[in-house]
């Protein structure tokens, strides 16, 4: 299965008639493995800051999580495993696997819990596969 299929079928899936706004699977180095057409263009330093927060949980809290020029307020996640952010009625979930970052961006009517479930379910599956 291609990485794009994981994005298209597992991240951009339909939940009660709604779906994520954007999603991607990127390497720890910031290289894009696959992304939805709506995923924002991001900078390598934004990914580096996310990776730093996985190594040093809480490092993003003072500045926020920035992706594609959008700033998200960092909210409770799972240190070293999941970073969650909020912006207005939407937000972001980032799940770290052994080799990749699984990223989902959502807006209402999708809920934070639905985004977390979609992103973390795929991340857990990839971790189980040694990825």
From Swiss-Prot:
By its UniProt entry, which SUPFAM superfamilies does this protein fall under? Answer: Profilin (actin-binding protein)
Q: What is its main location?
A: cytoplasm
State the UniProt keywords alphabetically.
Actin-binding, Allergen, Cytoplasm, Cytoskeleton
Superkingdom assignment = Eukaryota
A GO molecular function term, named singly, is: actin monomer binding
**Which compartments is it annotated to reside in?**
Cytoplasm, Cytoskeleton
- Give one Pfam family: Profilin
Q: What are its GO cellular component terms?
A: cell cortex; cytoskeleton
Q: Which Gene3D superfamilies match?
A: Dynein light chain 2a, cytoplasmic
Q: Which family does it belong to?
A: Belongs to the profilin family.
What is the purpose of this protein?
A: Binds to actin and affects the structure of the cytoskeleton. At high concentrations, profilin prevents the polymerization of actin, whereas it enhances it at low concentrations. By binding to PIP2, it inhibits the formation of IP3 and DG.
Q: Which PANTHER family match?
A: PROFILIN, PROFILIN-3
Q: How does it assemble?
A: Occurs in many kinds of cells as a complex with monomeric actin in a 1:1 ratio.
Q: What is this protein called?
A: Profilin-6
Name its species: Hevea brasiliensis
Q: Print the organism lineage.
A: Eukaryota, Viridiplantae, Streptophyta, Embryophyta, Tracheophyta
């Amino acid at each position: 299965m291609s990485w794009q299929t994981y994005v298209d079928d597992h991240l951009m899936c339909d939940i009660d008639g709604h779906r994520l706004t954007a999603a991607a699977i990127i390497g720890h180095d910031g290289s894009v493995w696959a992304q939805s057409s709506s995923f924002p263009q991001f900078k390598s330093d934004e990914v580096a800051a996310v990776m730093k927060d996985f190594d040093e949980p809480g490092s993003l809290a003072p500045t926020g999580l920035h992706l594609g020029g959008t700033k998200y307020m960092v909210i409770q996640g799972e240190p070293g495993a999941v970073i969650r952010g909020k912006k207005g009625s939407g937000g972001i979930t980032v799940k770290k696997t052994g080799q990749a970052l699984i990223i989902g961006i959502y807006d209402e009517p999708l809920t934070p819990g639905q985004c977390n479930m979609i992103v973390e379910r795929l991340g857990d599956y990839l971790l189980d596969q040694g990825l």
